[in-house]
């Protein structure tokens, strides 16, 4: 830990998130753990009175996400979900043009989100592919960005029809964990993927 602090230039590091939340010098928290830890850490941050930025999806289920949102609101805390694409200059400019009436009535928005980190069947079976630990697959990981952007630009979605599929049903089981999407070592043994890796949505 001391080596990481020195190498990365941080003032301090913590071995446990509870230690961080107990520090009175910490003003705001970024919750960027794997999905299955979001709920636990967010509720602890709320109990500690710490405002937070939380990665999406907020929880592995709608019930978990709702509980976090309601608890934060009851505590009067400022929070944000990690929909970072809405703050890119192009999106902010498009939103302003729409608000100013410069492009007329918006009748159609098309949004594609493609990520290659899950495209290879040789990629490792990680927590992202587990219903218990990852929750939804591409719906929570990528579609959530699309749904946020569409509503940020054009208003609330009122009706949805959708279909999803799983194109890679099995993946190699890791023998050594990596960080993020890289650095994983895998075995020849395969494990089942539990969530979807493709989804298409038509929304009004």
What residues fall within each predicted segment?
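N-terminal Rossmann-like NAD(P) cofactor-binding module of classical short-chain dehydrogenase/reductase
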Residues: 21, 27-30
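Short, Asp-centered acidic motifs that coordinate Mg2+ and/or phosphate
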Residues: 12, 27-28, 108
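Beta-strand-loop-alpha-helix segment that lines the small-molecule cofactor/substrate pocket
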Residues: 28, 34-86, 101
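Short, well-ordered coil/turn residues at beta-beta hairpins
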Residues: 32-33, 153, 195
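NAD(P)-binding Rossmann-fold cofactor-contacting core
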Residues: 1-6
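Predominantly a Rossmann-like dinucleotide-binding segment in NAD(P)-dependent oxidoreductases
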Residues: 85-192
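Conserved SAM-binding strand-loop segment of SAM-dependent methyltransferases
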Residues: 10-17
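Active-site beta-strand termini and strand-to-loop segments that position acidic
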Residues: 196, 201-204
